């Protein structure tokens, strides 16, 4: 098809791509204007609610937003690493501190909070930092509650309610979430929001992970 295009048609297509890139860059700058630090090549689709003077996003940060996507650092610190993807309807609210590593993907309608907001009769208010390690994939409508530390390369199943720490290379599911499988990555690592497997910086070969059933 490209060979059938005239030089003028190719030029017009190139100009359209450049304009689209500029629009995306301006959109990201406007949507993320309140963050304290913004990385390179950020993309924001839709109109997310982004509020927080103590929020940092790394390079290649992507938000696929509807009107419900909310990122709030409030009185706390909210940190996103490089190549983080946030899907429609996800809500992340930091009152104390939430840290998200590199290559992390949030599916739609995920809810992450580091505070109960208020206590109830017989149970005091709880507030504790949340940490999500590199290479994690958080499934649709999963909830991550205050005080949870999720290790590296963890897959959180759809609808899971994570109430306690999760070790590296685990698949967790259920309410409350528990480890149902251990995942082994013998040679390569996965960038969660990509469809393909990509090699670790020090490894040339790539293999898919071996799934090991737990007793």
Per-region residue spans from a language model:
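Conserved hydrophobic/aromatic beta-strand scaffold that supports enzyme active sites
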Residues: 161-163, 171, 179
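Domain-scale signature associated with acetyltransferase and cell-envelope carbohydrate enzymes
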Residues: 1-113, 133-135, 152, 168, ...
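Beta-rich strand-turn-strand
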Residues: 93-95, 141-155, 160-164
